[in-house]
Curated annotation (Swiss-Prot):
Family from the record: Belongs to the peptidase M4 family.
Origin species: Photorhabdus sp. (strain Az29)
Chain's role: Metalloprotease involved in the inhibition of insect antibacterial peptides. Reduces the antibacterial activity of G.mellonella hemolymph by 50%. Reduces the antibacterial activity of cecropin A by 80% and completely inhibits cecropin B.
Keywords from the UniProt entry: Hydrolase, Metal-binding, Metalloprotease, Protease, Secreted, Signal, Zinc
Superkingdom per UniProt: Bacteria
High-level lineage: Bacteria, Pseudomonadati, Pseudomonadota, Gammaproteobacteria, Enterobacterales
Keyword Transferase: no
Field pH dependence: Optimum pH is 7.0.
Activity modulation notes: Inhibited by 8 mM 1,10-phenanthroline, but not by EDTA or PMSF.
Coiled-coil residues: none
EC class (word): hydrolase
Enzyme nomenclature, EC number: 3.4.24.-
Protein name: Protease PrtS
Residues that, per the record, bind Zn(2+): H169, H173, E193
């Protein structure tokens, strides 16, 4: 049976919103519930088509130049909203509009300059974003070829355009959709989330010209409102340590296969936002081992793995790891290959000596947890 992938990917997972709903005041529950219900419907529906949104996914027009279009939903939920800033227009004066415009360019430039990729689809796809979606909507998501940003409530989350890596993360879901199109459940779904975290973080580092040891490796560093106990939504450096707050709860991400969360499919699509901490940590390990700018070696290994025809849509952590080792060797040398093997081994995923030359992904093997 052909599995049709869910092309809607949200930044804030249901379990965070459930914690906020449980712990917030009665007066705040309605807004939280609206975001929670919407997020869950986006994750669980395999196909969502609405007549009031732009379908930017089948645009075959080839362009060599950046084209951004920013829309304002005016706190409604009809998409795309009103066009308020198109390519080449001056600053709008609305911080959300201008942040989206600026960081869409930063993401485009990252993929163009580092990977010679022409927008998300490598064909010059227009970048479309809608801001001010919903009333105090507490999420951002990628769907049907566009970005959507909520304003947050100002008490838990700030406006979702404040973090460049959030925009880089969600647009990277578009790149994944146009390449490996990893199925958004279980380990392949966790890799989908992790790869978006990886490239979102690299967009920030590239924009700030940070080396691996200078970066925070935090996703959504500017998102948490004043008074919330945390540094962001996820930490690639220390999975599970991003936040510990009375409203948000404690970050449940593991950083090692020993702590892998075996969730059912109805719980975060099998833990896609949770178990992504394991490959996140593996990438961080490699970036630190190699030093310098993380996009130059570690990033290129991950990107070439994403493009590999042997990467199955239902891949596992181990299968993905094998391919990263293959590309580390093919792109660089034995030292980088060994660093890649060691980085996965440190999170409990062991690429065996007899496996490392295969480079093929059958999508069936299970991650080995013994080190």
């Amino acid at each position: 049976m052909q599995i049709q992938n869910n092309n809607y990917k949200g930044l804030i997972p249901p379990y965070i919103l459930q914690n906020i709903y449980k712990n917030t005041s009665e007066s705040e529950k309605d807004n939280v519930l609206m975001t929670l219900n919407h997020t869950q419907s986006l994750m669980l529906d395999s196909v969502i088509k609405t007549s009031d949104s732009i379908d930017n996914t089948d645009d075959e027009v080839v362009s060599d130049t950046l084209h951004r279009s920013i829309y304002d939903a005016k706190n409604e939920t009809k998409l795309p909203g009103t066009l308020v800033r198109d390519e080449g227009d001056p600053d709008n004066g609305d911080v959300a509009v201008d942040n989206a415009y600026k960081y869409l360019e930063a993401t485009y430039n990252f993929y163009k300059e580092v990977f010679n990729r022409n927008s998300l689809d490598d064909k010059g796809m227009k970048l479309i974003a809608t801001v001010h979606y919903g009333k105090e909507y507490m999420n951002a998501y990628w769907g049907r070829g566009q970005m959507v940003f909520g304003d947050g409530d100002g008490k838990v989350f700030n406006n979702f355009t404040t973090s460049i890596d959030v925009i880089g993360h969600e647009l990277s879901h578009g790149v994944i959709e146009k390449t490996a199109d990893l199925i958004y459940f279980f380990q392949s779904g966790a890799l989908n989330e992790s790869i978006a975290d990886v490239f979102g973080s690299l967009v920030r580092q590239h924009y700030l010209k940070q080396k691996a040891d200078e970066a925070s490796w935090v996703v959504g560093e500017e998102l948490l409102a004043k008074g919330i106990k945390g540094v962001g939504i996820r930490s690639m450096k220390e999975p599970g340590k991003a936040y510990d707050d009375p409203l948000l709860g404690k970050n449940p991400q593991p950083g090692h296969m020993d702590d892998f969360k075996d969730y059912p499919i109805y719980r975060d699509n099998g833990g896609v936002h949770v178990n992504s901490g394991i490959p996140n940590k593996a990438f961080y390990n490699l970036a630190i081992k190699l030093g310098g700018y993380a996009w130059e070696k570690a990033g290129k290994i991950w990107y070439n793995t994403l493009l590999d025809k042997d990467l199955a849509r239902d891949t596992t952590f181990l299968s993905f790891a094998k391919l990263t080792v293959k590309h580390a060797r093919d792109l660089f040398d034995e030292d980088v290959e060994k660093a890649t093997i060691d980085s996965w081994k440190e999170v409990g995923i062991k690429v065996k000596e007899e496996d490392k030359d295969k480079g093929k992904d059958e999508g069936k093997d299970k991650a080995e947890t013994k080190v």
